[in-house]
């Protein structure tokens, strides 16, 4: 608590928050950089060690427990090791999976007044559409029911308020313009490395921006045990910017004097560490160990750590206003000050109802009108920026308070993030889980390297007294290496001591021949240990070899899928927290866009999912009237559907359930709801085409049946006419024969018919007429039956067509 005693008092009227008061707040923050005051965050050194480990740099002090578990001071303990980043591949697997996960969101209006207005607009529009359908008498009952069902589906699933439509299109536009998925992917890497994921939303040049915050460069104060960065009462961001970036960001608030200071800043550390009286400021060189962490032991007293190696590769000092690369130190402070507001009770002059409104502290209460007042002290987000040691800009209340209409005290700084901790404790990140195994792997691999270097194989013992006279060792090694001959001279006389003048071969100096230095078994043991360490790391992290794509030949497809699925369950908690951070960050970005667009119209080309563009214009004042929230669908079913989309699309293409163009759009669309609408629309079009084809087929069949009926009727008519002509011919012949004389052509005389013959002829004619009448009746019956059969067929075809359309 003593560290905050020097912080200026915040419960002051706005008139007393002078420029000097604001500078004092920033100067207090200038003394607190690099320190860790959060109860749920790891120290900066701990995070720096993790980041360096992923970048291939080892902190040997962090390996002491592995290299020297007994704490023995010995020269054989190595002071440097070669690092083998076996954990990086597992982190990259998760990073790749994050980039492919579905994050399907939809912007909705959340404030109650706007929701009521949306309900009224939806109701009025629905009633208008229903009235138009009722008054339209040209449609049948079946068509009316179909349109009513479509209308119900539209207003249930697809209808959106115009503000929600604009918010969705605006957010999708900025997501593509800023490549926000890549920003989130980098933040997910921070979460796996140090257990923190933080983003900042702000307004730069009149445009809303979102950036990832480096966990090494942010200090959080007074956040309690909350794992949300938004709950902090004070945040310090410390970074080194190039002079060009400083001017780009603050050009509208920098004076010519400030620009001159930036152009003439010092360019070496000694110039800043010594003041005008040649006094050395020791704060620039060392930091109190108690404020850092327990990762590095104290040496030479309390002050030990040189922060010059924290930010970059030894060219920056976190307490200097510049670094050796020509960059300026930019210190940004965000804190919650106190503001007095008045809650005034008044009465509507027309209805007499009570009304409550909030006013600033300088509001004059009109007691004659019956106004009553209550005063409250609420939180107000402030900001300030210190550039170098002399430039102070933007010391003011935040332009964006990120508060809600129902709570004027709720606010934050536009810095959104989460600590991946458990039960109010400090985070234990994925890198922290795997780091001991990677250290052990490096130590064992160092032994393996030394064992391989010392594995000389079989060594020949050489007695120099037997080397032939006049030969040196190099010549002898040449014959042994090239000719594989070990030459000895047993008659060479000794030259030293008691052996002088004696033959070397007569001495009892027979060598042992070969010395075996082969340590292959030891090397194999080290290799087995390395494989064991990899397996243990995979089990602890929950990232199996199958998930990394390392599959042996004996594994089955089902076994690999099961192993991958179980592995994904272990790491799902990381993605759950990450999706929540993404949701809050996008909501914060929308709030930032509201203030950035207020007072002007935003006209932009909205980039659709298929890379086509659409011009959209948004009224900033109307857009800022509502509060917005995100509805996210990232359930397991959604993720599984995304994974199976390839198989389903291929099956749909083979069965011609979907068109090829629709399948290509499915892969370019990022919204699951849009994919469902594309599939439903294409299925509807295919059904309509199939129904139209069936209708045309039925019409063709009906035409063929009609033509066949006409042909059959023509044949019957022709047959009837032929029968009539034949009968008439027979009657005429009979009449001629009955009335005519003898046939003289053939010279045969035929007597006249007798009465009996005439009677027989008349009887035959009568029988023929009756038979002709029966044939006519039968022909009429056949014709009527054919018409009935054709009518039945037409009705059956119509019934089949209507059933297919339904």
From Swiss-Prot:
Disordered: region residues: 783-806
Highest taxon in the source lineage: Viruses
Compositionally biased spans, kind Basic and acidic residues: 783-792
Predominant location category: virion
Interaction with Cargo protein 1: region residues: 337-380
Record's subcellular location: Virion
Compositional bias of kind Basic residues: 795-806
Entry protein name: Portal protein
Organism: Bacteroides phage crAss001 (Bacteroides phage PhiCrAss001)
